[in-house]
Structures are given as C-alpha cells and as structure tokens.
C-alpha cells in the first residue's frame, strides 16, 4: 500500500469518528437546520475541492500538454483565475434572485444540480479526448451553479439566529467545519483517484458528491420550518414572457448563461473589464445605500463592510494560491515522500477540522470575559498569519536554491508550516467574516450583500491568476533555479510585504471601524 492510499483510508476513518462527535456534542445548542445545512455543504465542498485538487494539474499535464511548460503554466493560471473569479462573482446574481424571487431553498437545489451536471461533463470530457470546448462548458455549469448555491446556504443558515444571538459565531464555525470536512476528504479521494487511476474518475466522484448534498438537503427540508421559501409564490408562478412563468424564466436564463461563461473563462481581458464594472457597481450601490439610509447606524455598518471587503480580497488572492501556484510548486519542487501532489490540498482542511473547535472555544471564553477581539482585529491577525506562512515557504525554497538544478527538493515540513499558519489565518477571518456580513447587512438585502462578499473572493482569484502568471514568466531555457526564484520573488513581494502593509493600515483604522459597527462584534 502506497502512502497516498494509506492517507485516503486513514482520512475516511478519522472523519467517520470525528463527525459524530461534533454533531452529538452540539446538537442541543443549535436548531436542527444547522446540521442539515452542515451535511449539504459538506458534500458540496467535497465536490468542489475534489475537482480543485487536481484541476491545475489536469490542465498543465493533459489539456495544454502540447504547449511549452511556460506557456502551459501561463494558460492554466489564467483560466484557473478567470474560472474562480466567475465562480465567486456569480453569487451576486444568485443572492439577488433568492432575495427577490425564488427563495433560498430553490436556489440551493438549482445550484447543486447545475454543479453536479458540470462535474459529469468534465468527467465525460476527460474520458473522451480532453476537448477545450467541453472543458469550458463544464466549468461554466460549475460557476453558475455556485452562484445559486454558495451565498444562499450561508444566508439561509443566518435566518435561524437573531442578529445578536451569541450562538451565531459558534454556528458558523461548526458550519465552516462541515465545509472543511468535505474539503479534507475530497483531495484524498478524488485527487488520489484522478492521478492514480484516471482524471475522469476524479471528476465523476466530485459530481456524485454534489448529488449527495442535494439529496441530503431535499430529504430533510422539514427541519426548515417554513423558512427559505420564495418571498411571493403567486408572483413567482405568474407569467413573465410568452406564457413562461418567472420560475422557469430563471432556469432558462441560467442555461443561457452557459455559453457566455464558457467564452468569458477564455477571454481574460473581457472578464477583467466585466469584473471591474461589477465591482464598481457593487461598491457604488452599497455606498449609495450607506449614505441614503435613514438610519445612521445601518449606513456606517455598510461602510465597515466595504473596508473588510478590500482586506478579504487581498487575503484570498494569496490564500488561494494553494490550488494554483502552490500546487505546481509542490508537484515540482517538494519532497512528497510518496504522497500525491493533489492530496496536499487536504492539509489545510485537516488543520481546520482540528483547530476549529479550539478557535470556537477561544472566542467563547474571551467573549465571556469581554476580551474577544472585534472582527477588524481578527482580520488583522489573519493577515499577519498568512504573511508568516509565506515567509516559511520562502525560507524553505531559498534553502534548496543552491542544489535545485541537481534535483534538490524542499523539505515537506516547510509546506506543512505554511499551511498551518494559512489555516490559523483563515480561521481568524473566514467563518467570522461570514457571520459578521449577516450582522452588518440590512435585513432586506442580506442575500445581495452576502453575494457581494463572495465577489471580493472573485477579485482575489483574479489577482491570484495574475500572480501565477508572474511566476510562469521565466525566460526561454530557464533553469530550475530560475523558475524557483520566480516563486520566491512573488511570494515575498506579495505574500509578505504587501500583506503586512495592508495589515498595518487595518490596524490603524480598526478603532473607527469598531465605532461604526454599533455593537456588532
């Protein structure tokens, strides 16, 4: 038995023991809906992270294998960034449709089915010739489906708690743990089988995971107690155009977006312009609402949201190198001791599974003592930790520069150290970020604001794609040492210096942000 298969088996055994412990220890403190959403999101993340674990490797080794390494890497980073940008921009539309028209439940089921189909298209394509056309169609279904699913399952969870319910951060941390249980199992399973058996099997298992999530959500809908339904069912069922009601119009419109997204994933410059327009539109709309609001508190909370939006964007631009350039770095320059490259994507999720309860306990204890940091300071600590993670991998890479041309490899401990601090940074930012967005948002626009929050990740991914291209730009005939130096330069300049600069600005404006939050923690 090789190391990769041993990890796969050990991972499943660990989760089958750990999940019941988490659920049973928390079930009396929270509504039953939390645990239905926990399992639905677990399987959705299994689907996404299963594909993400090997997507960049599939592109460089199969889809663009006829290009030079530099050209293949550059094309793959660009597509990876554009796809993920659309993946996280689409929740803006999905959040609005759920708020105004179809409700959270229908949005979540529609998104899950779209993503299942997208994974199946990718599986078929990998098995039958690796054509770019079908590849982009599959990615488009995933991006559109994510738009319906991602913002609405988080917003739906928020409806089961009052604005200042002390259990809310705890609930979102448990929910976030569900995300990462799926993210832990997926690379171990889909990533391993994709590389050891066939890429099509990895995509297929990811699709079946998403179908499982939809089934869990639908079969347990009774626990939702009337929440998440369309805001106006007669209006939804009324005719929109040519005898087609509004519900069917939404579905048809989603299908019509598939060729549009397929084009945009390839047309990076056009995608850039669209993202800029969307970004300025979102921020302009939020700014307009902040200043026109009749309630001063509501307006100032929206201004806090905008500040956190920018910090969030920079964080994810660097954090999400994990599925892109860090995956390539691991594949080519790290001593993996027989572990599949894609399985390293499980390290972050494993640390979250282990550390999320610790962070929940820390925030709870500090909260009781009135010492818990406000959200802006948690974001500050997150930025410090991601910078430390990049500093660790830079030190590891520099340590082998003299012998990399002769086959020297980065010791695995540096990769694990980087993932550890990136994980603690993520735990300081992401679950509390989801929670605070629902608290800062006006009730009538929570879906839109949550969608806007995911757009900040879209911008982060787009920036991340450009960082990947900087890494993929050594001159023709570059040695391994020159290629590794490109990783070092980008990680040091962006992952350390720029991140620390953003952290310093956030530290100095935190007192003002705290004041403008008006009691929201």
Task: Tell what function each PLM region has.
Residues 100-113, 298, 365-384:
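Cytoplasmic membrane-interface "Motif A"-like loop-to-helix N-cap segments
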Residues 110-130, 384-404:
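C-terminal ends and interior cores of transmembrane alpha-helices
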């Amino acid at each position: 038995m090789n190391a990769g298969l041993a990890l796969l088996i050990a991972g499943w055994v660990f989760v089958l023991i750990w999940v019941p412990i988490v659920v049973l220890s928390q079930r009396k403190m929270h509504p039953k809906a939390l645990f239905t959403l926990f399992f639905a999101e677990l399987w959705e993340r299994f689907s996404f992270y299963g594909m993400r674990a090997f997507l960049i490797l599939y592109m460089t080794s199969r889809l663009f294998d006829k290009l030079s390494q530099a050209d293949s890497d550059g094309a793959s980073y660009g597509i990876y960034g554009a796809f993920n940008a659309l993946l996280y921009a689409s929740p803006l539309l999905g959040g609005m449709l759920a708020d105004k028209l179809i409700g959270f439940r229908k949005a979540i089921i529609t998104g899950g089915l779209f993503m299942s189909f997208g994974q199946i298209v990718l599986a078929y394509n990998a098995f039958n010739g690796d054509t770019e056309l079908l590849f982009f169609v599959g990615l488009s279904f995933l991006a559109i489906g994510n738009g319906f699913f991602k913002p609405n399952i988080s917003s739906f969870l928020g409806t089961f708690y009052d604005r200042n319910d002390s259990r809310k951060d705890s609930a979102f941390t448990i929910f976030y743990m569900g995300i990462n249980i799926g993210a832990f199992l997926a690379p171990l399973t889909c990533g391993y089988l994709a590389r050891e058996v066939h890429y099509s099997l990895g995509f297929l298992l990811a699709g079946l995971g998403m179908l499982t999530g939809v089934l869990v959500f639908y079969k347990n809908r009774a626990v939702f107690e009337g929440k998440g339904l369309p805001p106006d069912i007669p209006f939804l069922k009324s005719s929109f155009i040519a005898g087609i009601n509004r519900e069917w119009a939404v579905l048809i419109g989603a299908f019509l977006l598939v060729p549009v997204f397929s084009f945009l994933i390839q047309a990076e410059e056009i995608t850039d312009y669209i993202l800029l327009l969307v970004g300025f539109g979102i921020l302009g709309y939020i700014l307009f609402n902040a200043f026109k609001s009749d309630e001063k508190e509501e307006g100032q909370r929206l201004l806090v949201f905008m500040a956190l939006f920018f910090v969030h964007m920079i964080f994810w631009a660097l954090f999400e190198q994990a599925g892109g350039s860090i995956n390539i770095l691991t594949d080519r320059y790290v001593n993996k001791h027989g572990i599949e490259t894609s399985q390293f994507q499980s390290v972050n999720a494993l640390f979250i599974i282990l550390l999320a309860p610790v962070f929940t306990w820390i925030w709870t204890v500090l909260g009781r003592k009135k010492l818990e940091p406000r959200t802006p300071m948690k974001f500050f600590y997150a930025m410090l930790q991601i910078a430390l993670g990049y500093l660790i991998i830079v030190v590891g890479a520099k340590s082998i520069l003299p012998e990399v041309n002769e086959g020297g490899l980065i010791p695995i401990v540096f990769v694990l150290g980087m993932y550890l601090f990136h994980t603690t940074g993520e735990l300081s930012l992401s679950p509390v970020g989801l929670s605070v967005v629902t608290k800062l948002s006006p009730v009538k626009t929570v879906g839109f604001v949550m969608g806007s929050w995911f757009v900040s990740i879209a911008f982060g991914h787009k920036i991340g794609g450009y960082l990947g291209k900087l890494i993929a730009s050594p001159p023709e005939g570059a040695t391994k040492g020159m290629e590794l130096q490109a990783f070092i330069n980008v990680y040091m300049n962006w992952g350390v210096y720029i991140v620390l600069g953003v952290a310093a600005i956030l530290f100095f404006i935190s007192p003002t942000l705290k004041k403008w939050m008006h009691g929201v923690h």
